[in-house]
Amino acid sequence: MGCNAVFSSSAAKELQYSFNWYENRAKGLGIRFINFIDMTIEFIVQNPKGFQNKKGAYREAAVKIFPYQIIYEYIEQNQTIYILHVFHT
C-alpha cells in the first residue's frame, strides 16, 4: 500500500536549486536528475520503512547515480511521508 508524500518548503527549494544546477551544466541533465529523484521517492512511498532510521524518526534514502540523499519522516498513523531535505552528499 502506498503513502502520501509531502515536500517541506526546504526540500522543494533544495530540489529546484539542484535541478537548475544540473540543467545549467548540460541540457536535459536536470530532467534526468528529477527522474532519479522520482524513482527514489516512488520506492519510499511503496516501502516507507525500507530505509533505516538514522537520527530519531528520520530516514535517509540514497539516490542512484546522483550523489544525493533524501531525508524523510514516515508517520504511520496517517500513512504520510514528509520529505524534509534533498541534499548533495
Segments the model singles out, each with a brief description of its role:
Residues M1-Y58, E76-N78:
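Basic, Lys/Arg-enriched alpha-helical interface segments
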Residues I31, Q69, E73-T89:
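Enriched for short, Lys/Arg-rich terminal
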Residues I44, K64, V86:
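Conserved catalytic core of Hanks-type protein kinase domains
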Residues R59-V63:
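Short acidic-hydrophobic surface loop/beta-edge motif
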